[in-house]
Amino acid sequence: MDTNVIVTKKFNYITFVLMALGAIGLVYGFLTDTHRTWANLLLNNYYFLSLALGAAFFFSLQYITQSGWSAMFRRIPEALMAYIPYAAVIMLVMFFGLHDIYHWSHPDLVAGDELLAHKAPYLNVPFFMIRIVLFFAAWILLTRYLRKLSLQEDSLGGIEMF
């Protein structure tokens, strides 16, 4: 069975055309409705991040339980986990749109709302940024470590890691 993937020029062309259409759509969204575009970007990022984190959970569960049955399709969760660094970059870009997304990021609104003022130690921009950076750093380190273990298992053969 041949497992080599051959990427043709036509495939590359179609891929770049679709990426260009996506970029044009993103620019159009920012030009027409900034608030909706930031919200959609956040929602899409959370959706694909949840798939990647679910794959990381499944993958780590396989190592914790020393499961051998999943070895034949472990590349699928590895591929999904590869999205996490891209999600981190998108979240860093999202910092520019915090005021369009989160009500609590406006200090004048927090001062006038008793409930938001009570939650201010947790819901504030600096602490939010710190949390996001720390979460993504932990997730990226975890997934890189899991990937390293997977590659070591490939090079050693069998289940020598356990």
Residue ranges and their predicted role:
Residues 6-9, 13-28, 119-162:
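Long, contiguous internal "core" modules enriched in hydrophobic/ aromatic residues
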Residues 44-48, 60, 129-133:
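Hydrophobic alpha-helical transmembrane segments of multi-pass membrane proteins
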Residues 22-26, 48-70, 139-147:
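Central hydrophobic cores of alpha-helical transmembrane segments in multi-pass inner-membrane proteins
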Residues 57, 76, 131:
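A residue-level signal for conserved active-site and pocket-lining positions in enzyme catalytic cores
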Residues 14-22, 45-52, 80-90, 127:
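Hydrophobic alpha-helical transmembrane segments of polytopic
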Residues 1-5, 28-46, 68-71, 75, ...:
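Membrane-interface interhelical loops and short amphipathic "cap" helices
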Residues 64-69, 73, 83-146, 150:
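Membrane-interface helix-loop-helix modules in multi-pass inner-membrane proteins
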Residues 16-35, 54-56, 94-100, 143-144:
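Alpha-helical transmembrane segments of multi-pass membrane proteins
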